[in-house]
C-alpha cells in the first residue's frame, strides 16, 4: 500500500508540474456573431492551411490529422491564398493533448506565435481539431495547453461544460484505421438482418477501471450480466500496472471476458452499451453504429457527435449514469417497431455522416457553412 501511495504522489507531482507550466487559459465565450468574420465568406467558402516552418516539421503528426489535412488539401475548398479563405486550419497537430501521448505536440503556442498575426487574427475563422484532452488523473477538458483564441474547436468527447453551441463542433472518436474514403453508397453491413435474428438483447465487452474517473458505470455492469441474452464482460487488463490496482473481482472478470468475442457480440446484439471511459466519448460508439447495433449511451454531459444536425433521439438511447442498472427493464419494454426504427436511423446516420474520414471532415465544414448561409439569409431579409 505504501508503494501505491508513493506512486500516486509521484504522478501527482509530475502532472501537477505540467499544469503549473501550462496554466489554464480561459476561453472567450464566443458566438458566430462576435468571433467570426462573415465578410471572409461572402464570395466563396475556401479553406486555407497554415504552412509549417522548418523548425516545426519534426513535431509529431498523427495518422488521423494527416488524413484530415490531406483531404482538405485535395478538396475543391482548398486555397493556398489566405486572402481568399473563409476557414483556416493549423498545419500543426492539435488532435492529441494528452501529455503522455507520443502524438502530443509541445510547441503549439510557439507555432501560433510564428504565424502572420494578421492571418491568425487571434484565431478568428480558425477551426481547431481535437480528439483527446487532458491527462491522468483528471483528464481536464477545459485546457488544451495552448491558447485557442477565438477559434472554433471541433472536438471529440465534448462536454456540456466546455462546448459552445452553434460555434464549436462535436466530433465522433474514431481509430486511425477508420476508412479514409468509401466509394460504395452503403456501409459494409448485412442490412437485411432484422432485430429478432440477433441472439443478444444487449451486450458490452470492454475494460473497466478499478479507480479514478470513468470507473463508476463500468464497475456496475457486471450486475447486469446473465450470460444468456445480456452479456456484460469487463477486464482489468489495461496499462502495464493493472495488477497493482486489481481488486478481488478482477481475475473472475478476466476469465469471463476471455470467453466472448467482441465482434461476434456486436454483430449479434440488438443493443450495445456505450459507457463513458476516462473521457466522455469512446471508439465503441462508431463501432456500434457500423455493426447495425443500437447504441445505449451512458455518459452524462456528453454532447453527441454532430448533434447540431443529427437527431440522436431517433438513432440511440441515452441513459443517465445513475440509471445504469435499470437498462434491461428499459430495453425489454421497447417495442419491436421502435427497435426497427432505431436501427434504421442508426444505419442511415452512420452512412450519411460517419462512415469515413472524408465524410466526417466534409460534414464539419457543412455545419459551419450552414451557419454562414443562415446568417447571410437573415441579413438579406432585414
UniProtKB/Swiss-Prot annotation:
Query: Which BP terms in the Gene Ontology apply to this protein?
Result: heparan sulfate proteoglycan biosynthetic process; nematode pharynx development; protein glycosylation
Of the GO CC terms on this record, one is: endoplasmic reticulum
> Glycosylation positions?
268
Which cellular compartments is it found in? Endoplasmic reticulum; Golgi apparatus
- Keyword flag NAD: no
In terms of Pfam families, this protein maps to: Exostosin_GT47
Phenotype upon knockout is: RNAi-mediated knockdown results in the failure of hermaphrodite-specific neurons to migrate to their correct position associated with a defect in axonal guidance.
Where would you say this protein principally sits, based on its record?
endoplasmic reticulum
> Is Signal tagged as a keyword?
yes
Q: Which residues form the signal peptide?
A: 1-20
Keywords attached to this Swiss-Prot or TrEMBL record, sorted alphabetically, are:
Endoplasmic reticulum, Glycoprotein, Golgi apparatus, Signal
**Molecular function in Gene Ontology:** enzyme binding; glycosyltransferase activity
Q: How does it assemble?
A: Interacts with rib-2.
Give the record's family classification: Belongs to the glycosyltransferase 47 family.
Its function, per the record, reads: Required for the biosynthesis of heparan sulfate by positively regulating N-acetylglucosamine transferase II (GlcNAcT-II) and glucuronyl transferase II (GlcAT-II) activities of glycosyltransferase rib-2. Probably not directly involved in chondroitin sulfate biosynthesis but negatively regulates chondroitin sulfate levels. Maternally required for normal ventral epidermal enclosure and for embryo elongation during the early stages of embryonic development.
- Recite the other comments: Does not display any N-acetylglucosamine transferase II (GlcNAcT-II) and glucuronyl transferase II (GlcAT-II) activities when expressed alone in vitro.
The protein here is known as: Exostosin-1 homolog
Q: Look up and give the organism this protein is from.
A: Caenorhabditis elegans
Amino acid at each position: 500500500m505504501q508503494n501505491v501511495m508513493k506512486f500516486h504522489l509521484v504522478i501527482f507531482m509530475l502532472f501537477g508540474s505540467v499544469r503549473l507550466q501550462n496554466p489554464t487559459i480561459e476561453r472567450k465565450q464566443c458566438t458566430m456573431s462576435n468571433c467570426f468574420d462573415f465578410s471572409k465568406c461572402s464570395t466563396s467558402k475556401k479553406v486555407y492551411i497554415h504552412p509549417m516552418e522548418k523548425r516545426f516539421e519534426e513535431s509529431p503528426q498523427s495518422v488521423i490529422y494527416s488524413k484530415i489535412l490531406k483531404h482538405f488539401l485535395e478538396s475543391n475548398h482548398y486555397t493556398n491564398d489566405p486572402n481568399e479563405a473563409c476557414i483556416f486550419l493549423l498545419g500543426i497537430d492539435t488532435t492529441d493533448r494528452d501529455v503522455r501521448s507520443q502524438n502530443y505536440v509541445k510547441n503549439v503556442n510557439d507555432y501560433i506565435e510564428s504565424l502572420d498575426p494578421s492571418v491568425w487574427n487571434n484565431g478568428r475563422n480558425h477551426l481547431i481539431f481535437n480528439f483527446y484532452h487532458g491527462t491522468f488523473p483528471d483528464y481536464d477538458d477545459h485546457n488544451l495547453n495552448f491558447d485557442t483564441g477565438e477559434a472554433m474547436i471541433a472536438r471529440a468527447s465534448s462536454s456540456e461544460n466546455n462546448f459552445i453551441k452553434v460555434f464549436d463542433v462535436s466530433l465522433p472518436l474514431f481509430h486511425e484505421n477508420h476508412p479514409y474514403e468509401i466509394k460504395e453508397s452503403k456501409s459494409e453491413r448485412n442490412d437485411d438482418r432484422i432485430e429478432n435474428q440477433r441472439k443478444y438483447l444487449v451486450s458490452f465487452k470492454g475494460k473497466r477501471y478499478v479507480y479514478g474517473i470513468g470507473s463508476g458505470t463500468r464497475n456496475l455492469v457486471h450486475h447486469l450480466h446473465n450470460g444468456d441474452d445480456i452479456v456484460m464482460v469487463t477486464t482489468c487488463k489495461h496499462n502495464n500496472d493493472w495488477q497493482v490496482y486489481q481488486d478481488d473481482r478482477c481475475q473472475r472478470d478476466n476469465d469471463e471476458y476471455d470467453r466472448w468475442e467482441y465482434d461476434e457480440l456486436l454483430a449479434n446484439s440488438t443493443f450495445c452499451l456505450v459507457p463513458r471511459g476516462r473521457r466522455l466519448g469512446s471508439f465503441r460508439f462508431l463501432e456500434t453504429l457500423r455493426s447495425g447495433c443500437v447504441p445505449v449511451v451512458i455518459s452524462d454531459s456528453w454532447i453527441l457527435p454532430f448533434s447540431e444536425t443529427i437527431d440522436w433521439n431517433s438513432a440511440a438511447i441515452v441513459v443517465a449514469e445513475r440509471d445504469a442498472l435499470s437498462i434491461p427493464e428499459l430495453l425489454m419494454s421497447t417495442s419491436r417497431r421502435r427497435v426497427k426504427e432505431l436501427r434504421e436511423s442508426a444505419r442511415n446516420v452512420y452512412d450519411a455522416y460517419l462512415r469515413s474520414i472524408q465524410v466526417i471532415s466534409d460534414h464539419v465544414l457543412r455545419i459551419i457553412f450552414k451557419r454562414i448561409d443562415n446568417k447571410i439569409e437573415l441579413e438579406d431579409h432585414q
